[in-house]
Design a protein with these regions (language model features):
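Extracellular loop-to-transmembrane helix junctions
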Residues: 2-27, 33, 70-106, 110-111, ...
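Residue-level recognition of pore/gate-forming positions within transmembrane alpha-helices
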Residues: 15-18, 58-59, 86-90, 130, ...
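Juxtamembrane interface elements at the cytosolic ends of transmembrane helices
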Residues: 16-35, 65, 96-110, 167-170, ...
Length: 383
């Protein structure tokens, strides 16, 4: 993709905005103490809109934009099944899980396991989750994020990895969860804005000058097969979708774990002002999940209807950015992709720091550590 000067200015402005907001909200107020609750749980003072936005920002990464658009191109709207089931999962977690977690006043999920079982279970799961987060989640977000940026924007892989890690680390290490959550609100605006703009332009082009509604109508006619939610067994994408038995069975195990027991998702709800704020935040996140197909899958179907000359379906979203978006808007779209990566990285870094500090450092290495030392350990580990 060719990047114009205007696009570059828009992207740099986005980076500066995120850094400035992150550093600004990281400042300690007058009389504010330097303790674990303030750093890891934002002083237990997050509002519902910050919780919901931060959950979505943590969940979505750049490879999801590219991958789900590619699935929309190859399979169609049926891929939205995963997103819609996730929205229902968020409702269940909000209703049944959140009141229990907040009543316990825990920092981490291993702490909950200690209360429910014993210290041995907590320790085993703390080390397990640290290994998964560090060696699987964090590395995959960095690699796939840098790979996506390399494919879309031509940024070298190594430079992308270093730049993304440094960008996410600057404000997340300094400001803790408060900085992560409040900058996530801005990230979500870019995510939704970039996705909506791409969808609008694609549908407008399909409308042949008659508007977006006409474009969507034409899309439904030109790609009618892409709007089936249940596929025939002969369809090449049949095995990529969950069957009925999976939807009512095994998928819920993964769904409820991810939204209800996954530290870097549930930590936002643990930082809520109250149970109602946490529940409303998760409801807000569920509402946004319902919109994700509009932002991600529909553009892929539009690329199919526009006869995009692709070698692989995953090229659908990059093709739309390269060929449809005007100067200036490309910068917003690139900022949206970067926002998806940076928000996920910052959330993962903060959660790794939280689990190690609260479940290992405070429990075994320095059980008598004062709050200032616990806070310092969290910041040092993030570095």
């Amino acid at each position: 993709m060719n990047i114009s000067t205007i696009d570059l200015i828009v992207f740099i402005a986005y980076c500066l905005l995120i850094l400035l907001v992150g550093l600004f909200v990281s400042r300690r107020g007058k009389g504010e103490t330097q303790d674990a609750s303030n750093y890891f749980l934002a002083g237990r003072g997050l509002a519902w809109w910050a919780i919901g936005a931060s959950i979505i920002a943590s969940n979505i990464s750049a490879e999801q934009f590219v991958g789900m658009s590619g699935s929309g191109y190859a399979i169609g709207l049926a891929m939205a099944t995963y997103e819609w089931i996730a929205a229902l999962g968020l409702l269940i977690v909000a209703k049944f899980f959140i009141p229990i977690f907040l009543e316990k006043k825990i920092f981490t999920m291993p702490q909950f396991l200690e209360e429910r079982f014993d210290r041995r279970v907590k320790t085993v799961m703390a080390f397990f989750w640290l290994a998964v987060f560090i060696f699987i989640n964090l590395t995959s977000i960095l690699y796939l994020g840098a790979l996506t940026i390399e494919n879309v924007m031509g940024v070298p892989m190594l430079a992308g990895i270093i730049g993304l890690a440094a960008f996410a680390g600057i404000y997340s290490i300094y400001g803790g969860l408060k900085a992560v959550a409040l900058t996530d609100v801005i990230q979500v605006v870019f995510l939704i804005g970039g996705g909506l703009i791409t969808t609008y332009i694609a549908l407008d082009m399909l409308g042949n000058g008659e508007g977006v509604i006409s474009g969507f109508t034409n899309l439904c006619h030109q790609a009618e097969d892409k709007f089936h939610l249940i596929l025939d067994k002969s369809h090449p994408g049949y095995m990529d979708l969950p069957g009925v038995s999976v939807i009512i069975g095994g998928l819920w195990v993964a769904n409820l774990y991810y939204w209800g027991c996954n530290q870097y998702i549930i930590q936002r709800a643990l930082a809520a002002k109250s149970v109602s704020e946490a529940q409303n935040g998760m409801l807000f996140a569920g509402f946004i999940k319902l919109l994700i197909p509009l932002l991600v899958v529909i553009p892929g179907i539009a690329a199919f209807a526009l006869d995009a000359p692709l070698e692989k379906s995953d090229e659908a979203y990059p093709w739309l950015l390269s060929n449809l978006l005007p100067v200036g808007v490309k910068g917003i779209a690139f900022a949206a992709l970067t926002a998806a990566i940076v928000s996920s990285l910052a959330s993962m870094m903060n959660s790794i720091s939280t689990i190690f500090t609260m479940d290992i450092y405070r429990s075994y290495l320095r059980p008598k550590a004062v709050e200032r030392d616990v806070d310092a350990c969290g910041r040092m580990l993030g570095q």
